Curated annotation (Swiss-Prot):
Compartments, record wording: Cytoplasm
Organism (species): Bordetella bronchiseptica (strain ATCC BAA-588 / NCTC 13252 / RB50)
Single GO term (MF): dCMP kinase activity
BP terms from Gene Ontology: nucleobase-containing small molecule interconversion; pyrimidine nucleotide metabolic process
Gene: cmk
Matching PANTHER family: CYTIDYLATE KINASE (PTHR21299:SF2), CYTIDYLATE KINASE/PANTOATE-BETA-ALANINE LIGASE (PTHR21299)
Protein name: Cytidylate kinase
Pfam families (UniProt xref): Cytidylate_kin (PF02224)
Keywords: ATP-binding, Cytoplasm, Kinase, Nucleotide-binding, Transferase
UniProt family annotation: Belongs to the cytidylate kinase family. Type 1 subfamily.
Keyword flag Mitochondrion: no
Length: 223
């Protein structure tokens, strides 16, 4: 283990990284191996984006979007996620929602509104949390911090394959352009920019299978 969690707190493994780096899949599989809970923090930002889009709010209206985040009515039930009582698992994976979420994630009001919601997922026996600032902001005392990286072309191909398998139309060139723009926004924003924590293990998954990446994380945990 990298460090000890705060006294009395459930242990946390954080897995941060850029969009489509595989962090969600890896987090779920590591959590399953350990018998822990999992937090997909990106889903909370996407749910906020979807709720704002349903209300016709432009992504530039920071106060209104922050108010939506503050009052967000969501429920997680296993693999299902509900927004205002309706299953939103398919909708939040649409690229329009993802791009909107990337823009509003830069707003301090939105990040603050979702901070305590994310920390509330920390329960025994442990939590695997994936996102962009899990190890730097949300769980700075995490027992193990992983920062996943992968070549942007590989990530775009991975996302394209995921969308097509879910029956969602996707264009590789469009995805690659959007991904580069989102990477720039995530790394350059003033609040909680995407960057590895000083004590994070940087893991390049470009040439690794999902199973190999999961094993690498488990090896770090058990070391």
């Amino acid at each position: 283990m990298a460090i000890s969690a705060s006294a009395g707190a459930a242990p946390v493994i954080t897995i941060d990284g850029p969009t489509a780096s595989g962090k969600g899949t890896i987090a779920h599989r590591v959590a399953k191996q350990l018998g822990w809970d999992v937090l997909d923090s990106g889903a909370l930002y996407r749910l906020t984006a979807l709720a704002a889009l349903r209300r016709g709010l432009p992504a530039t209206d920071e106060p209104a979007v922050a108010a939506v985040a503050q009052a967000l009515d969501v429920r997680f039930d296993g693999p299902h996620v509900y927004l205002e009582g309706r299953d939103a698992g398919h909708e939040i994976r649409q690229e329009e929602v993802g791009n909107y979420a990337s823009r509003i994630a830069a707003y301090p009001g939105v990040r603050q509104a979702l901070l305590e919601r994310q920390r509330a997922f920390r329960q025994p026996p442990g939590l695997v949390a994936d996102g962009r600032d899990m190890g730097t902001v949300v769980f700075p005392d995490a027992s193990l911090k992983i920062f996943l990286v992968a070549d942007v072309e590989a990530r775009a191909q991975r996302r394209c394959k995921q969308l097509i398998e879910k029956g969602i139309s996707a264009n590789l060139d469009d995805l690659l352009r959007d991904m580069r723009e989102r990477d720039a926004r995530d790394t350059q924003r003033a609040v909680a920019p995407l960057a590895p924590a000083a004590d994070a293990h940087v893991l390049d998954s470009s040439g690794l299978t999902i199973e190999q990446t999961v094993q690498a994380v488990l090896d770090f945990w058990r070391a």
